[in-house]
Amino acid sequence: MALLHSGRFLSGVAAAFHPGLAAAASARASSWWAHVEMGPPDPILGVTEAFKRDTNSKKMNLGVGAYRDDNGKPYVLPSVRKAEAQIAAKNLDKEYLPIAGLAEFCKASAELALGENNEVLKSGRYVTVQTISGTGALRIGASFLQRFFKFSRDVFLPKPTWGNHTPIFRDAGMQLQSYRYYDPKTCGFDFTGAIEDISKIPAQSVILLHACAHNPTGVDPRPEQWKEMATVVKKNNLFAFFDMAYQGFASGDGNKDAWAVRHFIEQGINVCLCQSYAKNMGLYGERVGAFTVVCKDAEEAKRVESQLKILIRPMYSNPPINGARIASTILTSPDLRKQWLHEVKGMADRIISMRTQLVSNLKKEGSSHNWQHIIDQIGMFCYTGLKPEQVERLTKEFSIYMTKDGRISVAGVTSGNVAYLAHAIHQVTK
C-alpha cells in the first residue's frame, strides 16, 4: 500500500512539474492505439462486397479467385469427398503434426512437382515442408531468404505479379525490384523486355517466376522462351524462386504445367518452389501447401530442413492436419489420384471452353476488336485489356464486377452468362 501511495505521489509531482506528461499519460490510458490509421480495403474483397449489395439478377462477380461450376456454384471435387470419407472411417486422432508437417504429404508433393523419377528425389538432395497453403509457403521461403541468402536482399518480381507477393517479401525484410513481363499492347508476354531486364539483374539476386498460369495476366512463356530464360538465369547466377499455385489447373496436365520447374532443375539450377492445393484440389479453406528447396546434396538438405523448422516453430509451430491428410490420401491412392487428375482436367477444360465461348460471343455481337489474347492466355485469370473507365461502365450499367485493371476470373463465367458478358463488353468497347 505504501508503494502504491508513493507511486501516486511521484506521479503527481511529475505532473505538477510537467503538465505535458500528465496529458500524455491520460491519452495513453484512454487508448493505446489512437494513432493507428484505417488501412485501405483489399481491392478484390471490395469487389465482392459491392457485388453482394447489388440486387440485379444478372450480376456477375468476376473478381473472386475461386473455381465455380457451370452453375456458378462452389465446387467440391468428388475425389476430395471420397478421401474425406476414407479418413473419417479410420477414426484417426487429432494430435499435433511434426513441425515440417505430414511426411507422406511432403513426399507426395515433391513427387507431383518434380516428377516421381526425378534425380533430385532419388538422391535425396531436397527438403519439402508442409505450409499454410501457397501464401504460407511464400512467407516461409521469403523468411528463409532473409535469414540465409547472404548475397543480396533484392527479389525481382514480374511486372505485374500477384498482389500478395509484394507484402510477403517486403514484410520478410527483402527489397523489391521488378522485371518486364506483360505487354499491354499485345495483351501477351513481353519476351524481349523480360530477357533484357533479366540479363541486367545483378548476379546472386533472387528472381521470382510463376511456374504456370501467371496471376494476374494468364500469360505464360512458351517452352522455347522458358529455355532462354533458364539460360540467362544460369549465366547470371540468379536464384530462381518458383511459385506454382496452379499445377494441373492451367492446362489440365500436371506434368505440362510443371515443365518450367523441371527444366530449370535439369539445367543445373537449384531452385526453391512454393505449391498450393487451393485451386487444383479446391482445398481453399483447408490451407494446404508445400515449400521445397533443391539443394547441392542430401547433407545440405538436412541442414536446410533444420533451419526451416526453426523458422516455422515461432510462426505457427506446426501446420493443420486435415487438409494434408486429404491431399495425401488423393496423391498416394492410385484410384483416387486417377479420378482427381480427371477432375482437374475437367475444371481446366471448362475454363478453356469459357474463354473460347466468350470470344465467339464477342464476334456474334459484331465486335471489331482482336480478342485472341483471351483464348491464348491460360488459367483462371484473364487480362482483358479493358480500361478502368470501361470497367466502371460494366459495373454501373451491367452489374459486372471485376478489378479496375480489367482482370477477370474466367471461373466466374458460365454457359448461362457468357453471352450477357460478351454483350456488355461489346457495349463498352465499341
Swiss-Prot record:
Keywords assigned by UniProt, alphabetized: Acetylation, Aminotransferase, Cell membrane, Lipid transport, Membrane, Methylation, Mitochondrion, Nitration, Phosphoprotein, Pyridoxal phosphate, Transferase, Transit peptide, Transport
Modification Phosphoserine, positions: S143
Gene Ontology cellular component terms for the protein in this record: cell surface; mitochondrial inner membrane; mitochondrial matrix; mitochondrion; plasma membrane
Transit peptide limits: 1-29
Record localization: Mitochondrion matrix; Cell membrane
Misc remark: In eukaryotes there are cytoplasmic, mitochondrial and chloroplastic isozymes.
Chain's role: Catalyzes the irreversible transamination of the L-tryptophan metabolite L-kynurenine to form kynurenic acid (KA). As a member of the malate-aspartate shuttle, it has a key role in the intracellular NAD(H) redox balance. Is important for metabolite exchange between mitochondria and cytosol, and for amino acid metabolism. Facilitates cellular uptake of long-chain free fatty acids.
Family: Belongs to the class-I pyridoxal-phosphate-dependent aminotransferase family.
Modified residues (3'-nitrotyrosine): Y96
Positions bound to substrate: G65, W162, N215, R407
Listed EC numbers: 2.6.1.1
Protein name as catalogued: Aspartate aminotransferase, mitochondrial
Catalytic activity annotation: L-aspartate + 2-oxoglutarate = oxaloacetate + L-glutamate; L-kynurenine + 2-oxoglutarate = 4-(2-aminophenyl)-2,4-dioxobutanoate + L-glutamate
N6-(pyridoxal phosphate)lysine PTM positions: K279
Residues bearing PTM N6-acetyllysine: 59, 73, 82, 90, 107, 122, 159, 185, 234, 279, 296, 302, 309, 338, 345, 363-364, 387, 396, 404
InterPro entries: Aminotransferase_I/II_large, Asp_trans, NHTrfase_class1_PyrdxlP-BS, PyrdxlP-dep_Trfase, PyrdxlP-dep_Trfase_major, PyrdxlP-dep_Trfase_small
Quaternary organization: Homodimer.
